[in-house]
């Protein structure tokens, strides 16, 4: 029985390896941002625009994260609940990053000095749990999931775009994503939330 299980396990690994390591690519413009014309390449998986005015804002309205990713009906990988959980996780990660150590206020109402944060998930690539537990596959990246997103900060009163980003990538080869389909996507979102906090801190001279 053990031999059968072992054969099945390694068979699944080799089959997935033979299929190659899927990585999230730039999904292109999703039509979510209010303006794409000022985006500039920061690195191979990151486009960004910064007006230089973010330091004037210390309060933030976080809109519900939009799910712009659409699965092919003939090949549904994620349940609706998994995608809804991903949206909630991203918003929570951003809220925690902004307010950590008494950083910034998350509010509900528009006002002077308040920016509105809009985030849309544009792609999700599933984590293959069976390929995420060995040293070899972690090094090669086999089984890594990922995600892509678009986001912007706009003045809550005027709608002026303050910052805009388009990001995509795969999960961590070090951190364990577990056996959930969205484990690596969540790791990425946690990282992106921390990057946002760092950008705001930098704008405030912290």
Which residue stretches match the model-derived regions?
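Bacterial N-terminal signal peptides that target proteins for export
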Residues: 1-12
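A structural "domain/chain start" motif
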Residues: 22-88, 198-206
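Surface-exposed short loop/turn segments
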Residues: 27, 100-160, 171-178
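Sec-exported extracytoplasmic/periplasmic mature domains
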Residues: 67, 91, 95-103, 126, ...
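Second-shell loop/turn segments in exported
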Residues: 74-85, 104-106, 175-183
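Compositionally biased, intrinsically disordered linkers/stalks adjacent to structured regions
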Residues: 169, 177-206
